[in-house]
Amino acid sequence: MQFVLVLNCGSSSLKFAVMNPTSGDVLLNGTAERLGHDVGSLTVKDESGKAVQEIKPGTHAQALELIVETLKTKNLMDKIAAVGHRLVHGGEFFKESVVINNEVREKVAECIRLAPLHNPANITGIEAALKVFPKLPQVGVFDTAFHQQMPEKAYLYPLPRKFYEEFHIRRYGFHGTSFRYIASQLESVTGLKNPRTVVCHLGNGGSLAAIKDGHSVDTTMGLTPLEGIVHGTRCGDIDPAIIQILQKQFHISATEMNEILWKKSGLLGLSGISNDCRSLEEAMAEGNEAAIRALEVYCYRLAKHIAAQMVALNGCDALVFTGGIGENSAFVRANTMEQLAFLGFELDKKANEETSRGKQGKISTANSKPVWVIPTNEELLIARDTAQLSGMTR
């Protein structure tokens, strides 16, 4: 039996999973954190539980070396047939997953200007994997690829045309691998053939996609993952003039402003408590006004974006919640859908409250437009793309 090693390389983290691309079974997975610091950590999980190891000085390359040592200990090293990489931004170069070669690496590097926080880390992961697995095929699966079929009216910004023509400034969208996985499950789960579906991928970062005939026709994130709904620490949609006003009023540098927009806003900024929805729901239950306010803004803006995605579909046959918040927060689902009752949505309270922690199910009433919770599995889709493109499966 041959397996795929799936890598998801962030600026200070590296997530991995060893998967059977056919069955979807995960033999081993884990996360290296605090990379780039003096001391990082690697948490590895298998059937027997989890183990935590220190990494010094905590680089991506050393994290991968430690992962390889773990694979050897588990007698899995010789069973890895290919490596699949989650890559954030492929620009207009990539409309589907690809085998990574020198040309692909160069184009991913070209997209750094579009994703300066994400693509450098992705490249670091590729380089580290090529050193450790020089003879194995490496496959790149892009977050942006699924949205490359959006119509021009959905991806253009109302800016001077030259910015698009010369610099490719446009809306790209993200979470594409998650949306593509959900799209692949829609007919078998809902019983509907090619339903017009709004999918809500809600986590620390969140976005929506309007899916028609299996393709994305609109989404809420834009040039970067900053646009769209309220996120955990990112602001989502704001008036762009706010940036210049704040910089002038408070003498904030561009770097500091970036830090505010990306890491100090969203649920964290609104509440002053946490970016974690679970923590805010606990605080809300205790009557904390800041937590109540933050969640009200989150759900209200989410409801508005759901309605907007329905415009792109000229209606809606089904709505799906996925991602950490989407799969587990009965409160967010209920509060959001109450605001969309006028569009024909009504949740079954019992079904909504019982559907979490990996459960899949319909959470709407019989008279409602169907609302589903479908757990996403980005790693499985990356593993299957990798297996197919590397020749493991046909």
Swiss-Prot record:
Keyword field: ATP-binding, Cytoplasm, Kinase, Magnesium, Metal-binding, Nucleotide-binding, Transferase
One protein family per Pfam: Acetate_kinase
Origin superkingdom: Bacteria
SUPFAM superfamilies to which the protein is assigned, alphabetical: Actin-like ATPase domain (SSF53067)
EC numbers on record: 2.7.2.1
Gene Ontology molecular functions: acetate kinase activity; ATP binding; magnesium ion binding
Necessary cofactors: Mg(2+); Mn(2+)
Positions with a binding annotation for ATP: 15, 201-205, 276-278, 324-328
Pathway: Metabolic intermediate biosynthesis; acetyl-CoA biosynthesis; acetyl-CoA from acetate: step 1/2
Protein's name in the database: Acetate kinase
